[in-house]
Amino acid sequence: MPKENFYNLPEKKRNLILEAIKKEFEEHSIKDASVKDIVEALGISRGSFYTYFKNLEESYFTILERETIEFHEIFLKLFRRENGNLFKALDFFGQELARELFKKEKYALYKNRYLYWTPDLAALWREFHMENRHVNSLEMDVAFKQVEDGRMKEFMHYIKAVVHELIRRSFLENWSQVIFLEHYEKQISWVKYGLKDILE
């Protein structure tokens, strides 16, 4: 999380810094973004930046935490809401995903995240997010335990792979929200009912 010096700044200055960082990560992936561009936009020194954030990644994660939603947490909430009915949760999940991904003010952030995410970033993000998450942790832990038990655990890894690839393709191929939902519903129907009909 940001350093204490950041939180000691006046609210107006904090917001200016966050907006500059957000703009940088809307316009560039994490591999192309730079502290240099951020401090030049703000008219501050590199030294000042490092009194607020440990590194560029921490500033990136701060924006992700503030501006985006963790999709697996959306799914876990739906799974819990539907009393463990996996198929119902998956049906609603597609609608929630499409609604969130295609918000105009968030689209660029999600695009740069899903096209340029790496295992190293994922590990750092998990550490950062667990320290700062704002969801009801007890509720989420109960839901997470349900889906991580036994055979469900491997199945959830499979669903995660399917969904992440759909999201990545949606950005690579510039899908609309409608096209994304069409692909999502088709692939989830394969999960539910198998491939027999399309192979015959």
Language model feature labels by segment:
Residues 1-28, 37:
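Basic, helix-initiating cap at the start of DNA-binding domains
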Residues 2, 26-31, 36-40, 62-65, ...:
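N-terminal secretory/targeting leader peptides
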Residues 13-21, 38, 63-71, 75:
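Generic hydrophobic, amphipathic alpha-helix propensity
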Residues 43-53:
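Short hydrophobic/aromatic patch on the recognition helix
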Residues 55-60:
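Short amphipathic alpha-helical segment with a characteristic S/N-K-E followed by hydrophobic residues
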Residues 62, 76-103:
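Hydrophobic alpha-helical connector segments
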Residues 69, 117-165, 182:
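Amphipathic alpha-helical packing segments from all-alpha helical-bundle domains
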Residues 165-200:
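C-terminal peripheral helix-coil segments that are non-catalytic and often amphipathic
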